[in-house]
A protein has these predicted regions:
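Transmembrane beta-strands of outer-membrane beta-barrel pores
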Residues: 33-39, 87-93, 128, 143-149, ...
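Transmembrane beta-barrel domains of outer membrane proteins
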Residues: 72-75, 125-129, 182-186, 228-230
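Repeated loop/turn-to-beta-strand initiation elements of outer-membrane beta-barrel proteins
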Residues: 80-83, 132, 188-192
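Extracellular/periplasm-exposed beta-strand and loop segments of Gram-negative cell-envelope proteins
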Residues: 38-64, 89-120, 146-174, 201-222
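Short glycine/proline- and aromatic-enriched beta-strand/turn motifs that initiate or cap beta-hairpins
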Residues: 22-75, 228-230
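Cleavable N-terminal export/targeting peptides
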Residues: 1-26, 231
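Membrane-embedded beta-strand positions of outer-membrane beta-barrel proteins
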Residues: 29-33, 85-87, 122-124, 137-143, ...
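Outer membrane beta-barrel transmembrane domains
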Residues: 195, 216-231
Length: 231
């Protein structure tokens, strides 16, 4: 919560120093739907739990690619800048089995790996063509506060080769940079567009849960279709 408050505070400070008061600036709500793709294996953080799990579980990191939904409030800072505060939601469950071991009856030793991320972001966009053109390309950057929950649930192999059922959970918040770019096409008081985002953050996992890694890499790319409502 402290990190989220900091992100919101940073955006409010930016708004406070704008020459044009926000109350009289162009404002809009942006709703987005698209997908999130996590960092590939060779780009993930050292100690990442998914990379460690690949040593003995059958899955791919790309299996965690999944749908992403979001909403954002945007306020114009003059004709060439926007400041925004947004929230999103991503969740993905990936079924896995052990690579080299099975149950005594020959069935697979099965688990579910589940990752949920709720990103809160504070961003600033630069619109080189301004707000009053038929097409509005933009680039921007900001900070993200990523609320995450990672779990592994199902059957597991103990050190003595016995099989047991269990659920292991790690959750928390992590902060990191956000870089974005996109284009909007105004249609009256509405607008449509597309956006690409890159994010980077690492979430810590509790040692008492015996995960194979000490962290979960939350970085990756998101690509969304946007609908904007101006007011």
């Amino acid at each position: 919560m402290r990190r989220l408050t900091t992100a919101v505070f940073v955006t409010c400070v930016v708004l406070g120093f704008v020459g044009t008061p926000v109350a009289s600036a162009q404002q809009q709500l942006s709703f987005s739907v698209g997908g999130f793709s996590p960092r590939p294996v060779d780009a993930r953080a050292t100690g990442d739990v998914l990379v460690k799990d690949l040593d003995y579980l059958a899955f791919r990191v790309s299996d965690f690619s999944g749908p992403l939904f979001g909403a954002e409030y945007l306020a114009g800072l003059g004709d060439n800048f926007d400041a925004g505060i947004g929230v999103g939601f991503y969740q993905r469950t990936v079924p896995t089995v052990y690579n080299d071991f099975v149950n005594a009856n020959g069935t697979e030793i099965e688990q579910d790996l589940k990752l949920r991320v709720v990103p809160f972001t504070a961003t600033v966009r630069w619109l080189p063509m301004g707000h009053h053109n038929g097409v509005e390309p933009y680039i921007g950057a900001g900070v993200g506060v990523f609320n995450y929950r990672y779990s592994e649930s199902g059957q597991f192999l103990a050190t003595d080769k016995s099989i047991f059922r269990g659920t292991f959970v790690g959750s928390g918040t992590a902060t990191g940079p956000v870089i974005l770019g996109g284009v909007r096409v105004p249609v009256g008081s509405w607008g449509v567009g597309g956006e690409l985002r890159w994010q980077s953050a690492e979430g810590k996992l509790p040692a008492d849960q015996d995960f194979s890694g000490s962290k979960i890499d939350l970085g990756g790319f998101s690509y969304t279709f946007t609908i904007n409502v101006r007011f």
